[in-house]
């Protein structure tokens, strides 16, 4: 089974305040067959998107304006309990308790193998 057929129905919400990073993440996810249901620059925008679409994955930056990753994750756990939250940060050096997985931004090439661990 290929990665594309495995992930074809999986959805992802991308939350990062850097537009270029969101764009790269979108391209990466879509190239692997994931459906990007939305992008948000902060947690305040992300929460209603997640509530509406119930994504399989939320790629969530830690340092966000208005509502940071930790605060957003707390709300997301309540409104989208089945969503897997991936902390995606340049400043965290280990997995925070609020995330299902952690990936440093300088290791972006490891994102898809990480997401595949949840798909199997």
Protein language model annotation of sequence segments:
Residues 1-11, 109-120:
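Non-catalytic signal-transmission and effector/linker regions of two-component phosphorelay proteins
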Residues 16, 61:
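Active-site residues of response regulator receiver
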Residues 19-38:
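Two-component/phosphorelay signaling modules centered on CheY-like receiver
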Residues 42-45, 68-71:
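Acidic catalytic/metal-coordinating carboxylates
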Residues 51-53, 75-83:
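Conserved phosphotransfer cores of two-component systems
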Residues 65:
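The feature encodes the CheY-like receiver
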